[in-house]
């Protein structure tokens, strides 16, 4: 595990203390084991300020071969962080992080729901991500598909913003018409979400 000087600095300046608060397993929760989620670690990090470099969470996530729910605390307010983490053949792939706003601890959306460890983890992600993952139809899809769809939507929104900026800068009428047609196509694609 390589720790860069900037990561070391972030640990020292931004973190007051780290608690390994809980270990959620099928035995401790009295539910079935999951296919990919064996246990969920709950780690509380007390911060020196409201900001924490995401590199710190990513490094911790990559060092611990289990799924992790981070609870960040600053001056009595809490923020839940969780990533979509895939562990295959002892290789850890940490994807995008989702987080709540700063809330009082009892208001954090972290209810244990599910009949097995996979669904408990998936529900944590859905609760914490909130509207960010609630894209598309009401049809229940798997979490990976929802995350991919949310990323596609985000990319499409970026393309639309860039195209709108390009249209504003373009002087030629013919080129503006072309770009507007392209913009309409992208907006139609976005409506599908």
Task: State where each predicted segment sits.
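N-terminal, leucine/charged-rich tether regions that mediate assembly and partner docking
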Residues: 1-75
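Alpha-helix boundary/N-cap detector
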Residues: 51, 112-115, 119, 144-147, ...
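Alpha-helical oligomerization segments
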Residues: 137-141, 146-193
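Extended assembly-interface/linker segments at domain junctions
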Residues: 54-139
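General N-terminal targeting signals
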Residues: 48, 85-89, 180, 184
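Peripheral peptide segments
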Residues: 43-48, 90-96, 144
């Amino acid at each position: 595990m390589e720790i860069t000087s900037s990561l070391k600095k972030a640990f020292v300046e931004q973190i007051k203390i780290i608690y390994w608060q809980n270990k959620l397993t099928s035995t401790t929760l009295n539910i079935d084991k999951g296919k990919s989620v064996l246990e969920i670690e709950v780690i509380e990090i007390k911060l020196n300020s409201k900001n924490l470099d995401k590199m710190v969470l990513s490094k911790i996530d990559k060092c611990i071969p289990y799924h992790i729910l981070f609870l960040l605390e600053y001056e009595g307010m809490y923020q839940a962080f969780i990533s979509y983490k895939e562990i295959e053949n002892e290789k850890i792939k940490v994807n995008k992080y989702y987080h709540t706003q700063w809330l009082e601890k009892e208001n954090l959306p972290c209810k244990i729901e599910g009949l097995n460890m996979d669904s408990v983890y998936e529900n944590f992600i859905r609760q914490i991500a909130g509207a960010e993952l609630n894209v598309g139809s009401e049809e229940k899809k798997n979490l990976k598909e929802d995350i991919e769809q949310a990323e596609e939507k985000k990319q499409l929104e970026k393309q639309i913003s860039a195209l709108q900026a390009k249209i504003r800068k373009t002087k030629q009428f013919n080129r503006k018409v072309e770009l507007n047609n392209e913009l309409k196509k992208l907006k139609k694609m976005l409506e599908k979400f």
